Amino acid sequence: MRNIIYFILSLLFSVTSYALETINIEHGRADPTPIAVNKFDADNSAADVLGHDMVKVISNDLKLSGLFRPISAASFIEEKTGIEYKPLFAAWRQINASLLVNGEVKKLESGKFKVSFILWDTLLEKQLAGEMLEVPKNLWRRAAHKIADKIYEKITGDAGYFDTKIVYVSESSSLPKIKRIALMDYDGANNKYLTNGKSLVLTPRFARSADKIFYVSYATKRRVLVYEKDLKTGKESVVGDFPGISFAPRFSPDGRKAVMSIAKNGSTHIYEIDLATKRLHKLTDGFGINTSPSYSPDGKKIVYNSDRNGVPQLYIMNSDGSDVQRISFGGGSYAAPSWSPRGDYIAFTKITKGDGGKTFNIGIMKACPQDDENSEKIITSGYLVESPCWSPNGRVIMFAKGWPSSAKAPGKNKIFAIDLTGHNEREIMTPADASDPEWSGVLN
């Protein structure tokens, strides 16, 4: 992964195409870069309100990444705003702002808003990026996320991940427990429920286009259905009735196929389904439990976990089921592997036992089983941490985290995100308990 953001703080401050080819996972932490997101200029009161809200979202996006430190507007010296003037760079350097964002919002006759921004390097006194967006009022948050994505990409060299969605399972705290599929922005905003809570639902997954989701619903104890829901129209249809399915399918990069695990005759195996013909093809053989399949970004490989050797471990096979190779060799049980969109790492859940009982861990390992450096790295641990999934740029991992009940408080489950390096762990706020997160690709 490119590492240009860590070079910004060097003595010869520079935001250019210079970049390291890979990030050092063991030593990936750096001080966040100070950035000033200035008040957006506006041509009327409606545009002013919109600009104010957008500045807050942009600043929050950059702060949540852990790579930027937005400077409080209370310390700003220069009073000019907008994109029509060249900043007084000395005034921004005086408050230690390495980067400056200026912008403006104008309301158009169509009712839409034209949003423009410029990213400045205050030390080199040069423009680094700029763009104009035309957006309807109801999509102002997406416009703010897109601006933050542009800033993130210009400084880090990696694509941003702010204009994305999270689908997850929401669970009420009161009895009886009600589980519903919910959808929200990556930062927890715009939460809405997609199912009514009348049946048990599990493991929502995005289709490759991110405008559809699939999830498992237990219509009855014996009948398990996989549903497809169109997020644009709200229409829902049954993909299939799969007795013994344990998780919703994961989709191939081309969107034509999906893999799932199904229990039959005492064993659980990996199956691939052709979404056009609905034809199933069994990929694993023998006895045991084979679950949680996930495609590689190029669709040529599948990672999954299996207890074929007594303890659940991680395996990789070709997408046709051939050339099976074990890739995990540490102590403990492995589960829920998820292949990074970059193709370099696989995230997983690992359960270890000690004197204090079980400990759940989220870790990453190199995806190449022949790599001598295929050592795993645990990035977070807890009473219950599970279901890792990746940001579209492979920089951040989102997961579910749980706490046990105590005399002072009931148990709870929430969604957290953490940097690939194991730093910057933070909670994604949800209205109720939450589990089984799935991260969309960047929205169109």
From Swiss-Prot:
Transmembrane stretches, start-end: none
Cited InterPro entries: 6-blade_b-propeller_TolB-like, PD40, Tol-Pal_TolB, TolB_N
Presence of keyword Cell cycle: yes
Subcellular localization(s) per the UniProt record: Periplasm
Described function: Part of the Tol-Pal system, which plays a role in outer membrane invagination during cell division and is important for maintaining outer membrane integrity.
Subunit-structure text: The Tol-Pal system is composed of five core proteins: the inner membrane proteins TolA, TolQ and TolR, the periplasmic protein TolB and the outer membrane protein Pal. They form a network linking the inner and outer membranes and the peptidoglycan layer.
Protein's name according to its UniProt entry: Tol-Pal system protein TolB
Organism: Rickettsia africae (strain ESF-5)
